[in-house]
Amino acid sequence: MRSSMRIFVLGTVLCLAMAGAALACTSVMVGKKATADGSVLVSYTCDGWYDHRLKVIPGGSHKKGEMVPVYHNICYQTRPGKELKKVGEIPQVEKTYTYFHVGYPIMNEKSVVMGEYTWGGREENECQNAIFMIEQLQVLGLQRGATAREVIKIMGELAEKYGYADGGEALTVGDKDEIWLFEITGPGPLWTPESGKPGAVWAAVRCPDDSYAMGSNRSRIAEIDFDDKDNYMYSPNVKSFAEEQGWWKEGELFVFHKLYNPEPYGSPYYQQRREWRAYNLLSPSVKLAEDAAEQYPLFQKPDKPVAPQDLMALCRDVLEGTRFDMTKGMAAGPFGTPTRYAVTKDMKPEDRKGNDWNRSISLFRCSYSFVGQVRDNLPEPLAAVAWFGEDQPITTCYVPIYAGTKTVPESYNTGDRIKFDPKSTWWAFNFVGNWADLNFAAMIGDIRAEQKRLEGKFFAEQADFEKKAAELYKKDPKKASEMITKHVGDYMTQLDKDWWALAWNLVGKYNDGYRITSDTLEPLGYPTDWLKAVGFGDHDAEPKK
């Protein structure tokens, strides 16, 4: 009995530790009538040490009786000590679709796109007898589903049958017509596959076509209308589990996030600051309170139609121009860096143990981000485009990758995270981001100029390329596929080359405290206010305290 209890406690702790490690991501979803071009949009920032390597995993036909392995640690495959672990297998389906694999998969050939964020949840939902982590569900959903609704149903049914072992998770799942928010948590420690009960608790809500929504590490689904099957989906135990736990009883208002995530993770404004910023930028007329005690309404209408570039800007945001501006104040150092490294509890002052830095949407430890754009007026291989960026958003550059792309350059699917690799595109972006922190205020202008030049080119050429590729697709789908793959590969290869060139240009231009050009050597020095704050000119033997 004691041994069993020790195993149970250890398993629970490990599950919570894995969930806690992923509590960092941000996603925004936008309905098709709220966008500038009628597309469905989604954005996602993968904010932690996750697999940055982008790979195209081909679909195919499968024989009856084939089995699919189920793994843990899929998302961690560049992190030491996180080996891929097989925990089971399930029957394969007759046909699977090609999908785009990265730490948390983002798109399939059927133009379904997907973002993610973790929300932790309650200990009462943790389960060690289940097998599915969220990224494995994403893989299977994208391999097997042709629409957002279909993908959600597939993931929900698989989790119910085989059990969900991860912490509370959310996925923003879109296609050419609609986009949904899917949230899932575990069935509790007593669940077993033989119990006959669902192995997960989940719910999904459809984003109104004229609205958008934002999520950042806390459950966001509010009241569920159980009679509205067009706009809500849920597991059969979503009410009964809460009732069995004593959290809810029939006749009371059923608010999913209050029942399954009543105490969100982290410092008080870890999630809220990002949510407020997104709504503040896209719907400034609403004037949401900066420090609201309650959650903001999930859905809002934007003040103006949203374009992919708006979501890119949102991903890159560091609260500039607000009283929380990450580039201002002593914490930004003399050169205005928005980077705030993690602070362990023992490092914090005694009266600040429960506090932390402000949290912006762009984060230095981001592995990759993307903006998904799905249209209903283009053939399937062109309908969805993932504007993909390696490393932190504020210093990345987004390159378009179409759903019909068959391969991507090797530099995008390689790179050891513990060893600098000049053959890895991720390292080009990570290097630029880290070098910029030496003097962010000076270097960010060079970086933004290159972002504007390259992304401007990609957007300017988008319509013409899509028109030509769509015309070719009508005549010869195979040649159109080759055209798409070459176009994407050429862009990605050029971006890799140009970003390494930018990296070495920054090294030469900004070093030893100077801005160096062919005919000037300009000392950058320090801001006057910062010099005063640190006691510049004092003749004391000891540094100013």
Task: Tell where the protein language model's regions lie, with residue ranges.
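Glycine-rich, aromatic-lined ligand/substrate-binding cores of catalytic
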Residues: 240-385, 389
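A contiguous strand-loop segment
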Residues: 25-133, 154-306
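Histidine-centered catalytic/metal-binding microenvironments
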Residues: 454-545
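Positively charged n-region of N-terminal signal peptides that target proteins for export
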Residues: 1-7
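Second-shell loop/turn segments in exported
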Residues: 124-128, 136-145
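Substrate-recognition/cap regions that form aromatic- and gly/pro-loop-enriched pockets
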Residues: 338-472
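Bacterial N-terminal signal peptides
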Residues: 9-19
